[in-house]
Regions:
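Catalytic beta/alpha-barrel core
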Residues: 45-50, 73-79, 93-101, 115-121, ...
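Acidic-residue sensor for enzyme active/binding pockets
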Residues: 46, 125, 140
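Conserved small/polar residues in nucleotide/adenosyl-binding loops
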Residues: 134-141
Length: 141
């Protein structure tokens, strides 16, 4: 379950002004990167679901951050379907980012009061995103 609610996460992102996006298959390397970012003032970190062992590494990062980086909101990126979003939310994701807008992911996140930032690459995709979303990720097409 998420440690921080939607508003807290969005405030952390706003106050930091950026969100590092990272993946590595080695949990120890990933922990060092999370800690370095935290020590540098980052309070929201996106780990991407893009490679081998992503689920296992993410679970370790969440546990590590709870102890070593208590104000860090750990989110998951590259999410394209609701089942994967739900799995990462069970592992402790505080926010979900995707390369596209998927209304089913939005429902999963909204039920849990977790921030969802869909990617949009066209005006049409922006138009499909509900008005209640305050953050969209723009992608070049």
């Amino acid at each position: 379950m998420a440690k921080f609610d939607k508003i807290a996460v969005l405030n952390k992102i706003g106050s930091t002004g950026m969100v590092p996006v990272f993946y590595h298959k080695d949990a120890e390397v990933a922990k060092k990167v999370v800690k370095a970012c935290y020590d540098g003032g980052v309070r929201a970190f996106e780990f991407t679901n893009r490679g081998d062992f992503a689920q296992e590494v993410f679970a370790e990062i969440v546990k590590f951050a709870a102890k070593e980086c208590p104000e860090m909101a750990i989110g998951i990126g590259s999410i394209v379907d609701p089942a994967t979003a739900a799995m990462y939310l069970q592992l402790g994701a505080n926010f979900v980012v995707g390369p596209l807008f998927n209304p089913e992911i939005a429902k999963v996140c909204n039920r849990r009061s977790v921030a969802y930032t869909p990617g949009c690459g066209s005006v049409s995709e922006v138009g499909f995103a509900p008005v209640s979303y305050t953050h969209l990720r723009a992608h070049e097409t």
